[in-house]
Amino acid sequence: MKNAFKDALKAGRPQIGLWLGLANSYSAELLAGAGFDWLLIDGEHAPNNVQTVLTQLQAIAPYPSQPVVRPSWNDPVQIKQLLDVGAQTLLIPMVQNADEARNAVAATRYPPAGIRGVGSALARASRWNRIPDYLHLANDAMCVLVQIETREAMSNLASILDVDGIDGVFIGPADLSADMGFAGNPQHPEVQAAIENAIVQIRAAGKAPGILMANEALAKRYLELGALFVAVGVDTTLLARGAEALAARFGAEKNLSGASGVY
């Protein structure tokens, strides 16, 4: 079994991604052909469930873009279900400390290395027990990315990085800026300093740093600092802003009173 996304991170090859929030397999397939290295299927803030994640995984599968799935929480039951439908790479939100990071890793591993429940006869991941020795191969194919998005998590970054089985650490700029007192302003100098320091620290520890940033200059800055998986846009934002721009060219008035950024 292979995980191309995990292999790319291990090799130090930067991966450029797009966030999927439309919760739709048709749009997921459309974007899978756009040329991004990875696509994030968001189960935290988008209206996804196990069934909609499954159909998006199926839609993306024929394309080179690699799927990354974010559950709504660091919950072993939810993680088990997502792995069984075929997710191999998970982005676990709001991880605050090393214990929570260890719990995330354990949820992705079969015993004795972890606590993932065995149900491979029912699972797309094992191709319904058609993958020989799946139970012994699956653990090494899992890629665990944890999200740090508060000052508390930042203060615990060193111990999180020491957890075996963590492949990457994703900095959540929206929640981090809010926690630091700069809600809606992830480009504030204090937030940017925290992000840049974290990227350097994560890479120095031999892990892959990641982030979502639609500002092209900042995204390139993070890549220069060593970020290895960077999402550079969100499908809902691309659709909304693109539609508004087209309407505006024909005289429509935009109502952007609630717009506060890409995410």
Curated annotation (Swiss-Prot):
Enzyme Commission designation: 4.1.2.52
Entry cofactors: a divalent metal cation
Binding-site positions, substrate: 147, 174-175
- Record's Pfam families? HpcH_HpaI
Which keywords belong to this entry?
Answer: Aromatic hydrocarbons catabolism, Lyase, Metal-binding
Give the top-rank taxon of the lineage listed in the UniProt record for this protein: Bacteria
What InterPro entries does UniProt report for this protein, alphabetically?
Aldolase/citrate-lyase_domain, HKHD_aldolase_ent, HpaI, HpcH-HpaI_aldolase, Pyrv/PenolPyrv_kinase-like_dom, Pyrv_kinase-like_dom_sf
**Where is coiled-coil annotated?**
none
Q: Which is one Gene Ontology cellular component term of this protein?
A: cytoplasm
GO BP, one example? phenylacetate catabolic process
* Pathway membership, UniProt: Aromatic compound metabolism; 4-hydroxyphenylacetate degradation; pyruvate and succinate semialdehyde from 4-hydroxyphenylacetate: step 7/7
- Give the site residues for Transition state stabilizer: 70
The reaction(s) annotated as catalysed by this protein in its Swiss-Prot or TrEMBL entry are:
4-hydroxy-2-oxoheptanedioate = succinate semialdehyde + pyruvate
**PANTHER family to which the protein is assigned, alphabetical:** 2-KETO-3-DEOXY-L-RHAMNONATE ALDOLASE, PHOSPHOENOLPYRUVATE CARBOXYLASE FAMILY PROTEIN
Annotated function: Catalyzes the reversible retro-aldol cleavage of 4-hydroxy-2-ketoheptane-1,7-dioate (HKHD) to pyruvate and succinic semialdehyde.
Tell me, how does this one assemble?
Homohexamer; trimer of dimers.
- Its name, as the record gives it, is 4-hydroxy-2-oxo-heptane-1,7-dioate aldolase
Q: Which gene encodes it?
A: hpcH
